[in-house]
Amino acid sequence: MHLSPSIGHDLVTGTRFMGAFTMFALSILLAFVNRGKTQLKVYNQARWLIFTGCLLLCIFNLVQFLGNFREQSITLSWAITTMFLVAIIPPIFLGNLFLLRAGHDMKPHIWRSVIFVAFCYGLFFYGLTNDLLIDDVEPHTTVTFYIALALFAKITQMAIVLHRGLKKTRSSLTDGELQQRHVALRYTSHAMNALLVVAVFAPWAGLSSSTLLYTITKLTLLMTLSWLVCEFCLYGYNMAEAIEVNDEIRE
């Protein structure tokens, strides 16, 4: 079955990102298994729903790929892919997992797993770029991902220091100082989330054959919606500590 150039481009693009996000979906499952449930039932249900949607989307695209894309289904497939990619940003879950667990009982194999997943993402993206000789995808976008990953590691380290400092010095701080520490931790978390969104969507900048204005608009919309999802994840993971700190401030 012959595919037009535009359809073939969508097939290659969709397959590449579905492969990468499948690995991230598996990393989410690992993170969920290694973290106890929170008391927020709605949040627990939502995170599993997002993971399930991610996995089903990957399966859907895999079936489409193995069965050969049909021209009438490519639009639907790409629309569903875009819709779910807005709601499934696995690195955000792992980043917030780090922020909460690194200060107390972080397990070493989780760190190793994340490093492995990040490496696979970069290798997968770089390998397909060269093997398939896609003209409008530059290999240097992989370097962008690793630079963002390094910055993410630095911001995570800052968040861990703030988190541990807040725990150790909580009893000796005044109400104002305690609130300032908590605000610093919160804004550091926001910065980490925003940076992770950039890391995930930076490679998309070279994938569009449309006008520059359309590409910028699309990226801005996706990154904004994804950042809101990040904030939802941050809210759930840090809710227990936020309530505890606020209760102490009130007392």
Q: Each predicted region: which residue ranges?
A:
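Alpha-helical transmembrane segments in multipass membrane proteins, preferentially the mid-helix core
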Residues: 27-33, 91-99, 152-175, 228-232
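Hydrophobic alpha-helical transmembrane segments of multi-pass membrane proteins
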Residues: 16-35, 45-68, 84-90, 115-127, ...
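Hydrophobic transmembrane alpha-helical segments in integral membrane proteins
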Residues: 1-26, 145-152
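Alpha-helical transmembrane segments
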Residues: 73-77, 139-157, 219-222
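Membrane-interface helix-boundary motifs at transmembrane edges
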Residues: 34-48, 74, 98-111, 137-138, ...
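The cytoplasmic-loop to transmembrane-helix boundary for the fourth helix
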Residues: 96-129, 139-151, 175-195
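Helix-loop junctions on the outward
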Residues: 2-5, 36-39, 55-81, 102, ...
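Membrane-proximal linker segments that couple transmembrane helices to downstream signaling/catalytic modules
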Residues: 230-251
